């Protein structure tokens, strides 16, 4: 094998192994066996992930049953990984593999070197120079061994570290250590610098933003905490590339901006994800399918700013690790989280499998099926569905696919350094807002703010800024471009408030926005009541005679959501996050966006080639007139006068391709 790279085929990233284009639909398991590997191989899977780990998982059972390879300082035993690789080679003789290498401090290392355990307290150890060097040496030794012995069968490597292998610094909750204190002084170039005390870091949950008297101190530390982890990933990536020379793909789990709830987004250390997403040394990013969007009546969702990854030619793997109806609820007698609420039967399982596939196919994302502790996919129906999805992906690859989104969503990690991590602000503006976005009936692209100067304004009609609390110069220039283009901007909560206060909000929205005095937990829109358990302070309303009200506070009857049309563009402001699909659809429709579904219970997954529909009940879809084929079933559907009726069936997913005339 000479070189593995990512190649766009008809607009979509694929794995290219010496010119052989392979669909990035893959398999992973903590308990690989001859049966589950060969089942997926026979279904057409060609890419397989192999985990090398002697670590104990969150469930207090081993990640891998094959044993440890990092035995002591500079002492390695590669026999356990060899045995596992040989199983994969035997069970998937035509497969290619990605080795997942766990870099954490082992129990022997913690005892010998007296450092914190990286699996639980990553940020307290990750700056330790000796551990970094020894972990990098282990990483390089494992790669060299694998390449020398099996190089023609490996397409890539994943670097794992931190809680649940996802580079989370979970349990330390930003707490200091001697190692971290030393690194912080060096970061600030200040020998007297101190990590802020816990009572300064843990601020009142009623306040959305950091207190003025501690803001500079806390914001500097939060940035250091996040960059420490991101920069460490890039350190290990550079070390790995010193061996790989970019001839194989390299990946990590990282950047869960939309998923980490509450204070976890700050504590776990993913806010500096842009550095990793844009690094030339990283090729692949992975995350599980969003946990909050897995129910049979939900929509499926990504955890990351997908379109920034795609723009930077990074392959994004969505991990399907849903607990299927066949999955045992426990492993070695220990309940798997969610095991007591697993998918109830094969219909629900196949519905969600197909829905995740439609989400990935519409966006051009990769996907792997995770048979976590074995047996989660042991049914003919499930393997047949996987076989069909692989064949569909191959057929789709022969035709051009591109985004038809007319909505650009912009999110930012760095704009959250100024926010109070206990306020729930990220949940309102980011995590929970995915629900409304998924149900507004139109596709959207989601970018990180680092790409603001590269987004083609002409492609979109509506721009949604979810958390532009502290926009930089690049974002401000982008906003001015939009305002000159005649498009629509939707602002959420407190744009440009963090440094410039109300004056900043008023200038960037071109509206008179005022602080709200009094308690409010409900906003009435034209379509529904938006009810909130907690709205942090400050709260705002619009006091502007030229604004068209779209949402009114229940108690004060002040305008919470409103639109203002100018000669060149339309400004829409919402004082609350987590807008529902109906409200977003109304804003999008007014902006001229093409709407495919006017029913919030029927999400759609759309690109230039197909229209994916997920409907548990009868559905009506807006699409070009003509005959369409559902490629899951080969059933025909007809759209007349731009509308298609889809009766409810046994399965909820329809993947519709218009027949050639």
Regions found by a protein language model. Give the residues of each.
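Polysaccharide-binding and catalytic clefts of secreted carbohydrate-active enzymes
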Residues: 100-102, 110-291, 299-300, 305
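A short, well-structured beta->alpha microelement
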Residues: 29-32, 271-276, 436-456
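Aromatic-lined substrate-binding rim segments of carbohydrate-active enzymes
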Residues: 34-120, 143, 235-243, 470
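Hydrophobic faces of well-ordered beta-strands that scaffold small-molecule active sites
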Residues: 25-27, 48-50, 97-101, 155-159, ...
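N-terminal carbohydrate-binding accessory modules
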Residues: 1-42, 396-398
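A conserved amphipathic helix/loop scaffold
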Residues: 349, 466-661
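Hydrophobic targeting/anchoring helices
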Residues: 246, 251-432, 517-538, 550-552, ...
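The substrate-binding groove and active-site-proximal loops of carbohydrate-active enzymes
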Residues: 23-30, 56-79, 118-137, 214-231, ...
């Amino acid at each position: 094998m000479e070189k593995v790279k990512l190649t766009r085929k008809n607009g979509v990233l694929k794995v290219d192994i010496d010119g052989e284009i392979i669909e990035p639909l893959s398999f992973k398991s903590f308990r690989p066996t001859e049966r589950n590997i060969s089942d997926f191989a026979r279904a057409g899977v060609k890419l397989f992930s192999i985990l090398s780990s002697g670590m104990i998982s969150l469930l207090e059972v081993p990640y891998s049953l094959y044993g440890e390879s990092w035995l002591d300082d500079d002492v390695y035993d590669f026999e356990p990984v060899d045995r596992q690789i040989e199983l994969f080679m035997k069970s998937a003789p035509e497969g290619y593999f990605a080795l997942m290498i766990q870099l954490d401090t082992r129990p022997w290392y913690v005892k010998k070197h007296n450092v914190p355990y990286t699996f639980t307290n990553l940020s307290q150890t990750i700056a330790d120079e000796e551990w970094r060097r020894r972990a990098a040496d282990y990483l390089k030794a494992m790669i060299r061994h694998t390449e020398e012995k099996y190089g023609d069968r490996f397409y890539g490597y994943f670097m794992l570290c931190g809680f649940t292998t996802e580079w989370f610094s979970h349990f330390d909750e930003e707490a200091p250590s001697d190692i971290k204190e030393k690194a912080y002084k060096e970061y600030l170039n200040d020998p007297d610098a101190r990590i802020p005390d816990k009572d300064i870091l843990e601020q009142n949950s009623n306040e959305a933003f950091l207190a003025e008297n501690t803001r500079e101190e806390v914001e500097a530390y939060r940035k250091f905490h996040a960059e420490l982890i991101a920069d460490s990933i890039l350190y290990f990536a550079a070390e790995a590339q010193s061996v790989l020379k970019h001839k194989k793909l390299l990946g990590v789990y990282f950047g869960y901006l939309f998923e980490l709830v509450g204070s976890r987004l700050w504590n776990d250390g993913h806010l500096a994800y842009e550095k990793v997403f844009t690094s030339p040394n990283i090729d692949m990013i992975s995350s599980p399918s969003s946990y909050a969007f897995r129910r049979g009546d939900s929509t499926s969702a990504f955890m990351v700013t997908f379109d920034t990854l795609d723009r930077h030619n990074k392959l994004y793997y969505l991990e399907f690790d849903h607990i299927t109806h066949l999955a045992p609820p426990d492993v070695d007698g220990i309940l798997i989280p969610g095991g007591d609420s697993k998918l109830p039967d094969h219909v629900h399982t196949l519905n969600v499998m197909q829905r995740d596939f439609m989400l990935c196919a519409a966006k051009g994302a990769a996907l792997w099926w995770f048979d976590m502790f074995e047996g989660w996919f042991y049914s003919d129906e499930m393997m047949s569905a996987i076989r069909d999805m692989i064949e569909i992906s191959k057929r789709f690859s022969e035709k051009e696919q591109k985004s038809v989104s007319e909505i650009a969503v912009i999110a930012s990690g760095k704009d959250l350094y100024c926010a109070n991590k206990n306020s729930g602000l990220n949940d309102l503006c980011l995590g929970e807002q995915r629900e409304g976005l998924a149900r507004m009936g139109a596709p959207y692209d989601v970018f990180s703010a680092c790409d603001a100067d590269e987004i083609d304004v002409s492609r979109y009609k509506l721009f949604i800024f979810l958390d532009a609390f502290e926009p930089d110069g690049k974002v401000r220039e982008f906003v001015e471009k939009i305002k000159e283009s005649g498009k629509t901007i939707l602002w959420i909560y407190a744009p440009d408030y963090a440094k410039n206060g109300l004056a900043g909000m008023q200038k960037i929205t071109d509206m008179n926005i005022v602080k709200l005095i009094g308690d409010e937990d409900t906003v009435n829109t034209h379509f529904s009541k938006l009810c909130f358990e907690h709205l942090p302070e400050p709260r705002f309303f619009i006091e502007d005679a030229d604004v068209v009200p779209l949402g009114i506070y229940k108690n004060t009857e002040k305008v919470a959501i409103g639109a203002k049309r100018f000669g060149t563009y339309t400004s829409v402001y919402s004082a609350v996050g987590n807008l529902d699909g109906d409200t977003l659809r109304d804003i999008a429709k007014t902006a001229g966006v093409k709407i495919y579904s006017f029913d919030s219970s029927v999400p759609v997954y759309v690109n230039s080639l197909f229209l994916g529909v997920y409907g548990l009940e009868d559905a009506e879809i807006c699409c070009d007139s003509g005959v369409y084929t559902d490629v899951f079933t080969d059933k025909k559907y007809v759209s007349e006068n731009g509308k298609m009726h889809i009766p409810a069936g046994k399965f909820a997913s329809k993947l519709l391709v218009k027949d050639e005339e």
